[in-house]
C-alpha cells in the first residue's frame, strides 16, 4: 500500500513539473494580484501584495502552496473562485445546483484577455465546467495611478433547465500574514459609522445585512483589514474594501487550516436561492479595494481620487450649497412660506432651495407620515400653482430649486395603493407589518419600474428647470413576498435591486446632468454602485455636531467629502452656530435651519461662512484629505485638505470635551509642500471677533507645519478653528 501511495505521489509531482503554467497578472502602480493556471487547468491565486519590480520574479511563484490535510497526495492551492463540492472544504465563491440536481462544480481555465478602460485596464478570465455547460467570467478593473482594483463576476449556463445559484461572490481574495485584524462598521438610525475592530482567528467571521432596502442601516458595506496589527492611519499594511450593492450584502472572513485569510464579498444568499435560466447572465456587484503599506490614509486618498474620476456621478464637477426647509417647517408650509424661504436662501448666499417631504397628494394629502406616499402630484391646498409655481418663485428669488421624493415607497392610505395593491411587497396570507407607516413597492416588477421612472420623468418634463432631487428610502423590506415573482421568491431580493438600477439607468441616460442626493432615513444607503447615479449621499439624520465628527471621520475613510452631505441644523443648540457650521464645512455644506432664529451676528456669520466655503471648496471637494487627530482617540479632532498643486490648504480643528488642564499638543499637518512658505489665516470668525491663535497671520514653511505643527486646540467644549494656508 505504501508503495502504491509513493507511485501516485510521484505521478502527481511529475505532472506538475512537466506542464507549462500560465500566469495572469492584474496590476496597479503599487499592487500586484497574480494568478496561475495549474497543470490540471484550475486557476489559483499565487500572490497579492506590493508590486514586484522584476518580471522574472513571477516565475518563482507557485500555485501549489500547501498539501491537503485529508490524506490527498496531490498538492493544493488557493483557488481564485472556489467552488462547492470540489476539493476545497471552506466557504465557496460559487455554488450551483445543476438542472439534474448535481451540486458539484469544477471550474477550469479557458482564456483571458485585457482591454483598455478609462483610467486603467480590465482583465477578463473565462472559466468553464467540463461536465456541465456552466461558464464564469472573472472581471478585474485595475486603475494603476489610483492603486485601486475593482472585481466582479458573471455566471451563465446552457443547461436544459434553470440552475439554482446559492453562492455568487463578487470575488475571492487570499492573504498571508502572522495576524489579521478587521474593522467593520455597524450603525443604526442616527448612529452611522460605528467602528469595531477584532482579530480574525481560525474559523469564520461574517458581516451581513438582511434589510433588503435601507440595507446599511445596521451594517455598513465596507471594512478595513490590518495585517500583523490593527489598521492604522499613517503606517502599516492595510486594505480598504467596499461592495457596490444597496441590497443584502455579506462579507465572509475565514482563516483556513494553514493560516491563510480568505475574504469573500458577496450578495447575501439569505432567502435568495437564485434560479438562473439558460442564456441569462448573473452579474455580481463590484467589489472595490485599495491596498497600502502606509496606512488607511493613503488608501482612502486613493479611493477618493478613483471615485471622483471614474465612479461617482459628475465626480469632477461642482456641488451645490443649499437651504432645506425640513427642520424649519416639517410638513407645515404653503406656497407663500416657501417663497419666503427661497428669498432667505438667496440672502444666505447658497445656490439652491430644497423642498423636503410634505408637498404631494390630494385625496390623502401628506400632512404627516401616515398618508400620501405614491401620489406624486402637488397638494393643491398647499401649493395652488404646483411645482411650476415653486420653480418660478425660486427663479424670481435667484436660486435653483430642488425637490424631495421617496418613489420606492407607498402608504396604504394612498390612491396608488388603492389602484395597485399587487405592486406592493406584502404577504397575501398574513397580517401586514408596517415600517414608518409605509410599505415598499416591488421594483422587480417592470410595470413598477415604469411607474417609478415616470415620477422623475414627469416632473422633469413639465419642469425642466428643476435642478436637484433628494431621493429618500425610509423603510426596510418587511412582509417579504413579491406578487410579481409568485412561486420564484428566491430571485426577489436580487431582482428588486436590479430593478432599482434599471430605473436609475433610465433617469441617468435621459438626464445625465441632474444632481441627486441619495438618502435613506439618514445613511441607510451608501455604496459606490448607487453613486454611479447620485452625486452625493446623506450621511446621517444625526446632525449634532459632536456626533457628526465621529460619523464623518468614519465615512471619510471610504468616500470623498464631495459625496458626503452635511447640513447645519438646530440639533444640539448648546453648541454655537459657528461650531455647527465649521463641522459641516468639512464636507458638502448645506443648511437645514430656521435662519430667523439666529441673532444678527450669527446670521452675518453664516453668510460669511458660505462665502468662505465657496472659496475653500476646491480644496475640500477636490483636494487630498488628511485625517490628523481622531475624535475616537481623545477629546479633539483635526483634519486638513490640500489642493492638488499643494499651493493651498485648509485646516479644521475641533475641541469636543477637553479634560481640565489636559496637555494640548500641536497639530502637525500633512501633504504640504515642504519647501513652500505658507501664510496662515484664520477664517470663519464671528463678526467683530479677532483670532486668538498665535499662528494667525504668520508665515511657516511646509516642513515646519508638518514636523512641528500649530497650536490650534483649546480646553473649551465646542470650540473650532478653520485656518486657510496659501
Regions found by a protein language model. Give the residues of each.
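Active-site neighborhood of glycoside hydrolase catalytic domains
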Residues: 384-386, 418-420, 424-578, 588-593, ...
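Aromatic-lined carbohydrate-binding/catalytic grooves of carbohydrate-active enzymes
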Residues: 314-454, 463, 467-468
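Bacterial Sec-dependent N-terminal signal peptides
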Residues: 1-21
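Polysaccharide-binding surfaces and accessory modules of carbohydrate-active proteins
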Residues: 22-35, 42-254, 270, 677-694
Amino acid at each position: 500500500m505504501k508503495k502504491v501511495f509513493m507511485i501516485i505521489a510521484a505521478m502527481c509531482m511529475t505532472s506538475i513539473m512537466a506542464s507549462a503554467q500560465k500566469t495572469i497578472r492584474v496590476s496597479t502602480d503599487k499592487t500586484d494580484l497574480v494568478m496561475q493556471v495549474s497543470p490540471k487547468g484550475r486557476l489559483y491565486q499565487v500572490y497579492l501584495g506590493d508590486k514586484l519590480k522584476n518580471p522574472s520574479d513571477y516565475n518563482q511563484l507557485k500555485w501549489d502552496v500547501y498539501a491537503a490535510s485529508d490524506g490527498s497526495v496531490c498538492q493544493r492551492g488557493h483557488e481564485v473562485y472556489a467552488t462547492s463540492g470540489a476539493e476545497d472544504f471552506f466557504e465557496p465563491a460559487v455554488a450551483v445546483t445543476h438542472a439534474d440536481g448535481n451540486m458539484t462544480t469544477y471550474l477550469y481555465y479557458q482564456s483571458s484577455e485585457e482591454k483598455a478602460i478609462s483610467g486603467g485596464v480590465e482583465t477578463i478570465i473565462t472559466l468553464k465546467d467540463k461536465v456541465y455547460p456552466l461558464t464564469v467570467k472573472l472581471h478585474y478593473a485595475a486603475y494603476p495611478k489610483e492603486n485601486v482594483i475593482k472585481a466582479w463576476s458573471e455566471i451563465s449556463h446552457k443547461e436544459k433547465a434553470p440552475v439554482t445559484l446559492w453562492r455568487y461572490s463578487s470575488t475571492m481574495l487570499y492573504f498571508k500574514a502572522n495576524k489579521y485584524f478587521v474593522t467593520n462598521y455597524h450603525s443604526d438610525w442616527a448612529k452611522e459609522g460605528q467602528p469595531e475592530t477584532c482579530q480574525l482567528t481560525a474559523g469564520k467571521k461574517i458581516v451581513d445585512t438582511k434589510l433588503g432596502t435601507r440595507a446599511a442601516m445596521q451594517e455598513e458595506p465596507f471594512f478595513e483589514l490590518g495585517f500583523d496589527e490593527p489598521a492604522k492611519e499613517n503606517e502599516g499594511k492595510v486594505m480598504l474594501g467596499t461592495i457596490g450593492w444597496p441590497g443584502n450584502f455579506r462579507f465572509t472572513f475565514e482563516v483556513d487550516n494553514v493560516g491563510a485569510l480568505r475574504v469573500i464579498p458577496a450578495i447575501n444568499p439569505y432567502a435568495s436561492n437564485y434560479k438562473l435560466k439558460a442564456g441569462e447572465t448573473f452579474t455580481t456587484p463590484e467589489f472595490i479595494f485599495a491596498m497600502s503599506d502606509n496606512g488607511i490614509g493613503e488608501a482612502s486618498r486613493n479611493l477618493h481620487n478613483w471615485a471622483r474620476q471614474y465612479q461617482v456621478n459628475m465626480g469632477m464637477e461642482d456641488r451645490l450649497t443649499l437651504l432645506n426647509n425640513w427642520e424649519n417647517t416639517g410638513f407645515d408650509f404653503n406656497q407663500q412660506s416657501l417663497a419666503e424661504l427661497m428669498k432667505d436662501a438667496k440672502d444666505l448666499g447658497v445656490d439652491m432651495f430644497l423642498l423636503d417631504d410634505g408637498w404631494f397628494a390630494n385625496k390623502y394629502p401628506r400632512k404627516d407620515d401616515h398618508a400620501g406616499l405614491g401620489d406624486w402630484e402637488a397638494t393643491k391646498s398647499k401649493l395652488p400653482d404646483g411645482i411650476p409655481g415653486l420653480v418660478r418663485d425660486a427663479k424670481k428669488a435667484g436660486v435653483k430649486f430642488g425637490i424631495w421624493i421617496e418613489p420606492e415607497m407607498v402608504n396604504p392610505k394612498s390612491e396608488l395603493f388603492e389602484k395597485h395593491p399587487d405592486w406592493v411587497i406584502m404577504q397575501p396570507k398574513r397580517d401586514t407589518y408596517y415600517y414608518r407607516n409605509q410599505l415598499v413597492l416591488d421594483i422587480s416588477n417592470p410595470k413598477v419600474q415604469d411607474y417609478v421612472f415616470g415620477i422623475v420623468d414627469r416632473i422633469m418634463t413639465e419642469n425642466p428647470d428643476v435642478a436637484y432631487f433628494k431621493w429618500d428610502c425610509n423603510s426596510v423590506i418587511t412582509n417579504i413576498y413579491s406578487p410579481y415573482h409568485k412561486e420564484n421568491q428566491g430571485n426577489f431580493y436580487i431582482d428588486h435591486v436590479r430593478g432599482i438600477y434599471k430605473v436609475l439607468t433610465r433617469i441617468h441616460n435621459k438626464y445625465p446632468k441632474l444632481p441627486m442626493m441619495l438618502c435613506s432615513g439618514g445613511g441607510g444607503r451608501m455604496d459606490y454602485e448607487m453613486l454611479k447615479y447620485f452625486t452625493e449621499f446623506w450621511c446621517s439624520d444625526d446632525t449634532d455636531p459632536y456626533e457628526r465628527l465621529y460619523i464623518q471621520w468614519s465615512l471619510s475613510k471610504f468616500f470623498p467629502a464631495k459625496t458626503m452631505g452635511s447640513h447645519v441644523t438646530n440639533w444640539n443648540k448648546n453648541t454655537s452656530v459657528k461650531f455647527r457650521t465649521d463641522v459641516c464645512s468639512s464636507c458638502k455644506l448645506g443648511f437645514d435651519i430656521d435662519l430667523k432664529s439666529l441673532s444678527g451676528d450669527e446670521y452675518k456669520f453664516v453668510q460669511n461662512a458660505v462665502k468662505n466655503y465657496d472659496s475653500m471648496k476646491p480644496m475640500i471637494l477636490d483636494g487630498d484629505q488628511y485625517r490628523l487627530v481622531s475624535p475616537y482617540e481623545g477629546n479633539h479632532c483635526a483634519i486638513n485638505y490640500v489642493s492638488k498643486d499643494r499651493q493651498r490648504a485648509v485646516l479644521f480643528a475641533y475641541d469636543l470635551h477637553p479634560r481640565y488642564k489636559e496637555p494640548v499638543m500641536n497639530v502637525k499637518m500633512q501633504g504640504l509642500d515642504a519647501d513652500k512658505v505658507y501664510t496662515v489665516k484664520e477664517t470663519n470668525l464671528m463678526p467683530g471677533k479677532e483670532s486668538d491663535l498665535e499662528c494667525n497671520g504668520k508665515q511657516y514653511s511646509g516642513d515646519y507645519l508638518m514636523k512641528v505643527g500649530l497650536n490650534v486646540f483649546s480646553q473649551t467644549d465646542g470650540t473650532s478653528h478653520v485656518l486657510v494656508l496659501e
